A protein has these predicted regions:
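Sec-dependent signal peptide cleavage junction
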Residues: 23-27
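Aromatic, loop-rich ligand-recognition surfaces of beta-strand-rich domains
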Residues: 433-436, 440-501, 514-553
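Glycan-processing catalytic domains of CAZymes
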Residues: 28-413
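Hydrophobic h-region of N-terminal signal peptides that target proteins for export
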Residues: 16-21
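Flexible, active-site-proximal loop/turn residues at the rims of small-molecule/cofactor binding pockets
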Residues: 14, 134, 271, 342, ...
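Solvent-exposed serine/threonine-rich low-complexity stretches and specific carbohydrate-binding patches
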Residues: 502-510
Length: 553
């Protein structure tokens, strides 16, 4: 796993004398696929066991990729909203707040990348910068596969893309980055959706000059790579330290010539600002002189805009991000780089994120978008990015007042647990384990039928005819309740006497590793007041057993 980009190297270095600059790149560029556009940084680096990827592991979901993500083994600062993904992988987290299982996606599935690029098109993200870390090791094959998915999805949805090399911990970068471009990545420039600027294919190299052990390269090594790429006829972007111009703090000295030989500069900002006042301070003291220096040299300037670290409560329901858009547009920046599209590892993602704790694993500690008390739709930061892009392009008047509403309707979600605390019935019970214990919200109390006789059933009166959409069934989360399969059918009735089977008898696996929880989807259009579960088998104990029964609708 790569070194995090988050780290802010706060110890200031003495200001060095700027190295001699190379020939300026020429006049600032006209609009193209990065100038005048919103570019989103796309990691595309998640995988899951069972996705048929070369890694066959939980890439970037877990610290230990061999084990599923769990409360004690994960690499996340934020949780994804999984609603739109067609393929989902169960984790070892407990159920979500709404009772559904906690699942994640894999970028090795084309459908995942297709969902992401569909969002980009729908919400006005013009261009995606696909991050490409050292491709020569064990991660190379899956990165190659994801790159092919990105091209296919970009072409399907009309979104531009380019390769963005990240040289973090790539010690043999100087020769290998050239070989990778020549032998593999250059072929992608034949795509009609490969980004071009000034008639040249776009490439970014991120990480030259950073003052940390993960990027130990000399100015000479970096200048060689810059000159080589420019010799290949590309438009070259430099992902550079925040303080590139003065070569202090997060920048090594003697890199001034390297920085000033790129066609475009995109200084990193994650970990540097966390509120509106920080954004204003950087606008005055860093971004404004940066822009002036780039204008003087004919270099395009692409500052970062970030939604804010959700885990650190930086977002201020969009005000933090909008202030950055306002500051960068009034500055006259040539383009904007969103950091990042899908960075759930650092909680800086604009991709869909749960609105409330209903979409977060219970007890995980992850925050939802309503963490400051303001409801925000799961797509809010995608919509905010779209509006920021319109302001950049002059389609929306420059304004310091955020025009994007956190929600598109004032009506909150109405889905609720229809069975909570409702009257229950049963075919039988053992000792004091009555059916009422299945709807009492206590995960450790449970109903158990008479032993040794099947079928058995448990029913609940919803109080009125309703439209239940799904059921969430649980056994106690204690590991002592070992894995078992219960065969269950679902029956429904309007009057409590004539029941119809709406879901046939099916074996459902209850496993402590996944919270001992099962979700049953109900037929669309179902209308009922009384619902019943009919148990006809249990591999773990000769009885029907149920600790929590939620009926959502």
């Amino acid at each position: 796993m790569s070194l995090s980009r988050r780290t802010f190297l706060g110890s200031a270095l003495a200001v060095s004398t700027l190295a001699a600059t190379s020939t300026p790149a020429g006049a600032a560029s006209p609009p193209g696929d990065v100038v005048g556009k919103i570019t989103v940084g796309y990691q595309g680096w998640f995988a899951a066991r069972g996705d048929n990827s070369p890694l066959n592991g939980w890439w970037h979901w877990s610290d230990n990729w061999g084990e599923p993500p769990s409360p004690t083994n994960h690499a996340l600062q934020s949780w994804p909203d999984m609603t739109d993904y067609p393929t989902k992988y169960p984790t070892a987290f407990g159920a979500l707040g709404n009772g559904q299982p906690a699942t994640v996606f894999s970028n090795h599935d084309y459908q995942t990348v297709d969902v992401h690029f569909r969002w980009m098109r729908e919400y006005g993200c013009d261009t995606a910068a696909l991050q490409r870390f050292n491709p020569t090791g064990g991660e190379g094959p899956i990165r190659d596969a994801v790159t092919a998915h990105v091209r296919r999805a970009a072409e399907a949805h009309g979104v531009k893309f380019y390769i963005m090399y990240d040289v973090t911990n790539w010690t043999t970068m100087q020769s290998e980055i050239k070989a990778d471009w020549t032998n593999k990545m250059r072929a992608y420039t034949s795509s009609p959706m490969y980004a071009r600027q000034n008639g040249k294919p776009v490439v970014c190299v991120w990480g030259f000059g950073f003052n940390d052990p993960g990027r130990p390269f000399t100015p000479q090594q970096c200048q060689d790579v810059v000159d080589w790429f420019k010799g290949q006829g590309v438009y070259l972007i430099g992902g550079v330290p925040t303080h590139w111009r003065r070569e202090v703090e997060d920048s090594r000295p003697d890199f001034g010539g390297v920085y000033r030989s790129f066609h475009m500069l995109s200084p990193w900002m994650v970990g540097r600002i966390g509120n509106v006042a920080d954004s204003d301070h950087f606008h005055t003291n860093v971004n404004t002189p940066d822009q002036a220096e780039c204008d003087r040299l004919g270099i395009d300037y692409q500052p970062c805009v970030l939604p804010g670290d959700l885990a650190r409560r930086h977002r201020a329901h969009g005000d933090f991000m909008w202030r950055q858009f306002y500051n960068m547009v009034r500055l006259g920046a040539q383009g904007i780089y969103i950091s990042m599209f899908d960075e759930y590892n650092e909680a800086n993602q604009i991709a869909k994120t749960p609105e409330t704790q209903a979409g977060i694993p219970v007890g995980s500690g992850f925050l939802a978008l309503d963490e400051d008390g303001t409801r925000c739709s799961s797509d809010y930061y995608l919509r905010l990015t779209g509006d920021g892009g319109r302001m950049l392009k002059g389609q929306l008047a420059l304004t310091a007042v955020r025009p994007t509403k956190p929600v598109l309707t004032d009506t909150p979600p109405v889905e609720r647990d229809l069975a909570a605390g409702r009257p229950t019935t049963q075919s039988s019970q053992t000792q004091h384990y009555g059916s009422h214990l299945a709807v009492d919200a206590d995960p450790n109390t449970y109903w158990e039928s008479a032993n040794g006789v099947f079928p058995q059933w448990i029913g609940v009166d919803l109080g009125a005819v309703a439209a239940p959409r799904r059921m969430v069934l649980s056994l106690p989360p204690n590991p002592a309740w070992g894995r078992r399969t219960q065969t269950i059918a679902v029956e429904a009735s309007a009057d409590g006497s004539a029941f119809t089977t709406v879901s046939p008898a099916t074996g459902h696996v209850f496993d402590p590793a996944t919270g001992n929880t099962v979700t049953l989807a109900l037929p669309a259009g179902l209308s009922a007041r009384h619902v019943r579960l009919r148990f006809s088998g249990n591999t773990g104990w000769p009885a029907g057993q149920l600790a929590r029964w939620q009926v959502w609708g």
